[in-house]
């Protein structure tokens, strides 16, 4: 399975769970980036190599990954999965969204999504797929 096939599966599964999904294909690598609920929930990096140090994605699914499952950098946490761990990734993403809805309340969560939709220039580059 390659990155495009993995992205297709994730988009299908996450859209069935009610996520709003934006996708960006990297220009210089085969990496694909998904933003969920306008970035309010989290981002997912789908790749076959280590990520750049200056970027941070909460969830990373990396083909053939062999390293720490959890990393911490500058008070940020990142989770790493192999392509075979897609079910666990989806469960963890759902849990992340549920934690944020509990913290902010559903109405505020939706309000924050709307604010990001209107004001974040990132979503001019990311294509909405769902």
Task: Indicate residue ranges for each PLM-predicted region.
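Negatively charged, low-complexity tracts enriched in Asp/Glu with abundant Ser/Thr
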Residues: 1-39, 69-77, 83, 95-130
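Intrinsically disordered, low-complexity regulatory segments enriched in Ser/Thr/Pro
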Residues: 40-96
